[in-house]
Amino acid sequence: MIMQKPDNITKATIWNILDTVVDPEIPVLSVVDMGIIRDIQLMPGEGHDTPGVEVSITPTYTGCPAMDVISTGIRLALIEHGFTRNTIKTILAPAWTTDWMTESGKQKLKAYGIAPPQTKSGAPSLNEKDSEVKVQCPQCNSFNTKRISQFGSTACKSLYQCEDCKEPFDYFKCH
């Protein structure tokens, strides 16, 4: 266990700890990269050796099965660093958006072989056709791609194939 001294604990300390907690479905991304950390509050020690920590998170979508694992991962990382008094709070509104992902996280997705979300978030309008969305292949960078299935390896991804290099790949859906 890595104990923190009460006098040098800052929110930055907690952010650094949280940056070590990975998304169980995409292990190259931390919960910080994903943008699901909404807030961090330090609570006074009140007779304890270290202050308490409250971490607010927003699921990538309602009912995301990874959220229990993520909450447990956050809790365990905090405990490992001596923050035994911790609370994980779920905030549903406003809903998470791919706009909250870090640029570093998007680059990590691409390096991992998953096309990162486009910069535009939200559902397409009724007039917008799926074929108009140009998704770049994370292998060869071609935009000559086609969607194979609306659903990929997880609910937040679609399955695409590159027409140039012929490689299939997941695309992280915008929302």
Task: For every predicted segment, state its role.
Residues 1-175:
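Domain-level signature for proteins that mediate thiol-based redox and metal-cofactor handling
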